Amino acid sequence: MRSVQNSPIGVFDSGVGGLTVLRELYRQLPQESMLYFADTARLPYGNRSGAEILQYVREILVWMSQQNVKMVIMACNTSSALALDIVRSEFNFPILGVILPGARAAVKQGQRIGVISTPATAKSNAYRQAIQEINPKAQVWQVGCAEFVPLIEANRIHDPYTKQVAWKYLAPLLAQNIDTLVYGCTHYRHLSPIFQEIIPPTVNLIDPANFVVAAAKKELELMGLRHNEPPLPTRFAVSGCPQTFSQISQQWLGYYPLTEQVSLPMTINPSLVREELEILE
């Protein structure tokens, strides 16, 4: 048990979006060691098919299993929407997604709920289903925002065009007089300064990163897996260019992370993917 307690928590996303979850882990679980993986060679996930996402997630989880993680947080709403329920039973460590914690937080704040997310997450209706399962009276409006992740990954957050895009995506939600807005993609917290210029202060902003980490903390405590000594330095790995990831991420981490490039194992049975494609799509 001692060795498992010392194992890292795995966190993955398509890119820098999951750093919002990582920073929250630093805040709520400062004594835990972390392993962060960004699938930058294949981002953005939001325009991928369900079968592609499932394949990518399985490859990442197999690799993380090889790194002896004790828990994995899918710091990616698209993965959480399209793959979490399928892969949870395939691995012997807990896997947490961001959608259910975000939905629970949203229904505590209001009943007219807007969700901004990737197109794939919006198409899945994962947030609407989760929110209305908790509160059937809640009204939910979803907008798939195809341009946000590429703009963030290109470090164009302060580009005037990004604000124009934000107006385009948020206007339909504001027209519905929403009282709550959910960041349905972990990348979007990086755009908070822009959103706060557009969204009235009466609208509650929900960042699921805060709540999935709280859930992870509770689960570690229940399983007796909390680490109570100083952690190892966070390990960063990517499937794409390490230097690009490090350069972009340092503005949110406060330091230039040493990042390694890794090759993920191919683990997919093509016939199984075809079968699950019918389920996911």
Swiss-Prot record:
GO terms for biological process: cell wall organization; peptidoglycan biosynthetic process; regulation of cell shape. It catalyses: L-glutamate = D-glutamate. Keywords: Cell shape, Cell wall biogenesis/degradation, Isomerase, Peptidoglycan synthesis. Pathway: Cell wall biogenesis; peptidoglycan biosynthesis. SUPFAM superfamilies: Aspartate/glutamate racemase. Its EC number is 5.1.1.3. InterPro entries: Asp/Glu/hydantoin_racemase, Asp/Glu_race, Asp/Glu_racemase_AS_1, Asp/Glu_racemase_AS_2, Glu_race. NCBIfam families: glut_race (TIGR00067). Provides the (R)-glutamate required for cell wall biosynthesis. This is Glutamate racemase. It comes from Rippkaea orientalis (strain PCC 8801 / RF-1). The lineage of its organism: Bacteria, Bacillati, Cyanobacteriota, Cyanophyceae, Oscillatoriophycideae.
